[in-house]
Amino acid sequence: GDPIYATGDGVVESTIYSRARTGYGTQVVINHGFGYKTRYAHLNKIHVQRGDSIKRGQFIADMGNTGVSTSPHLHYEVRYRNTPVNPVHYFDKDMSEERYQEIMKQIESSRN
């Protein structure tokens, strides 16, 4: 399947390999800190392991058709404090690395 890339820095919290035709099938969950996690599901193959440090844009998996899925696609989910939120606000393919780092610094400084 098509390559799947992480949308932010984080640590792989879990990887689940499943060919059962239930749920999300094969999936990766990345913990980004500050209460944020992303889930990438219905994958064909996972290229990372639990505990791996991940960088934004890093290749993590191949798109697939596992779990409850009628055709190959990616289920992309953002959660904040375990509540699903609209993912459209959390990715921007055109954002430069410099702008991304600037935003991350603002988030970190607001926590202090």
Question: Where are these predicted regions, by residue range?
Answer:
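Soluble non-cytosolic domains of exported or imported proteins
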Residues: 1, 68-69
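Extracytoplasmic/periplasmic cell wall- or extracellular glycan-interacting regions that localize
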Residues: 1-7, 101-102
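Conserved beta-strand positions that form and line the central face of beta-propeller blades
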Residues: 3, 29, 39, 62, ...
